Amino acid sequence: MYGNYSHFMKFPAGYGGSPGHTGSTSMSPSAALSTGKPMDSHPSYTDTPVSAPRTLSAVGTPLNALGSPYRVITSAMGPPSGALAAPPGINLVAPPSSQLNVVNSVSSSEDIKPLPGLPGIGNMNYPSTSPGSLVKHICAICGDRSSGKHYGVYSCEGCKGFFKRTIRKDLIYTCRDNKDCLIDKRQRNRCQYCRYQKCLVMGMKREAVQEERQRSRERAESEAECATSGHEDMPVERILEAELAVEPKTESYGDMNMENSTNDPVTNICHAADKQLFTLVEWAKRIPHFSDLTLEDQVILLRAGWNELLIASFSHRSVSVQDGILLATGLHVHRSSAHSAGVGSIFDRVLTELVSKMKDMQMDKSELGCLRAIVLFNPDAKGLSNPSEVETLREKVYATLEAYTKQKYPEQPGRFAKLLLRLPALRSIGLKCLEHLFFFKLIGDTPIDTFLMEMLETPLQIT
């Protein structure tokens, strides 16, 4: 095709100067336009006999260099130009090129592809003529296309997998012929013995497969250790101990019934909350690593989450109560009392979104403790000196809770997710309760005790 280079060749008009294209404590969150320049279109050589000169029509198809999917190409490209005739009287002689001879010699290689729009014309990206530049893309075992260097030898995926299986399973093969079978792309599966021997002869290393297996095992063990270290560092037993240590004894409630509450239900709730705030500090100190934080960060976390922590506690305590809640003081607050006091809406949400859900899934004390620890370790609390440390502690509680649910309730694979789904409801209800408390504090009709008043003096939760 490229035989006679002494022929005169015609080029498209403007070949010498092809134009280029130019491109033109509160819950608060923690927290290249490149130009693609198309490559100049290169004219393609074509044979033109001396006796019958022809004019070559150029199809202007600029080629854009491939880049990242995030690159923005801003150059405005016009439509392809039409056929351009060469100016009369201008004939150019195509100089002989040793590179063109290389193209002739490897014209069957897959490296040579036709230029888009001009079928039959080889592209100008000539392969290197250095020894081995083409061989390295061929599988040394069967001659198929190589996918890279595997176990010391350039090989295809098929021969790589065959050698790895042979070594890992310690397979032994036999040859039915004379141990000199031809191994190529079409017949590589006919004799496993000769294929394996050729792998060894070409330089594949058994120890490379064994080292790869060892690295995979070590990586798996390391990942397993990382997964278990989270709940070993935050043992669920200690979280359960913290819950049991501060929970009022059920026998202290006596035989109190719904009628024991003689005062306004809101007053009873505020009084119980004030008492529970003292025990809340003791509970937090028993949670692993909480006391390791700075004193300032401990105060910030308690101020940011005290309302949600108390609501979670009395909601879980009330799962056995019919249509009401059980306070830490032993008093019951019935739904009807809450409605008469003007807090029926938020009371109904507590019963529906928290108490009822906890009862349906039979949430145990360990799960309750983990959920409360997740609320406690809030990395978004405003003013923390080291939010990343708090976030790490929260992630450890996540890992502990997930491991616990998988081990204790293997028949409920979605239990961990169900538990976490209670947190948004707890957050929303906690904010609404704060609004009520601030209202009662503002109007002054409800007596609010000292500790609770101190918490309300810094309204961190209102966002």
From Swiss-Prot:
Gene (name only): RXRG
Alphabetic keyword roster: Acetylation, Cytoplasm, DNA-binding, Metal-binding, Nucleus, Receptor, Transcription, Transcription regulation, Zinc, Zinc-finger
Tagged with keyword Cytoplasm: yes
The family this protein is said to belong to: Belongs to the nuclear hormone receptor family. NR2 subfamily.
Species this chain originates from: Homo sapiens
Pfam families: Hormone_recep, Nuc_recep-AF1, zf-C4
Ranges of residues in domain NR LBD: 231-459
Bias-annotated ranges (Polar residues): 21-33
GO biological process terms, semicolon-separated: cell differentiation; nervous system development; positive regulation of transcription by RNA polymerase II; retinoic acid receptor signaling pathway
InterPro entries linked: NHR-like_dom_sf, Nuc_recep-AF1, Nucl_hrmn_rcpt_lig-bd, Nuclear_hormone_rcpt_NR2, Nuclear_hrmn_rcpt, Retinoid-X_rcpt/HNF4, Znf_hrmn_rcpt, Znf_NHR/GATA
UniProt region (Hinge), positions on chain: 205-230
Residues within the DNA-binding region(s): 136-211
A Gene Ontology molecular function term of the record: retinoic acid-responsive element binding
Annotated spans, Disordered: 18-53
Compartmental location: Nucleus; Cytoplasm
The protein, known as: Retinoic acid receptor RXR-gamma
Domain notes: Composed of three domains: a modulating N-terminal domain, a DNA-binding domain and a C-terminal ligand-binding domain.
Positions of NR C4-type zinc fingers: 139-159, 175-199
Region (Modulating): 1-138
Tissue-by-tissue expression: Expressed in aortic endothelial cells (at protein level).
Post-translational changes noted in the entry: Acetylated by EP300.
Function text: Receptor for retinoic acid. Retinoic acid receptors bind as heterodimers to their target response elements in response to their ligands, all-trans or 9-cis retinoic acid, and regulate gene expression in various biological processes. The RAR/RXR heterodimers bind to the retinoic acid response elements (RARE) composed of tandem 5'-AGGTCA-3' sites known as DR1-DR5. The high affinity ligand for RXRs is 9-cis retinoic acid.
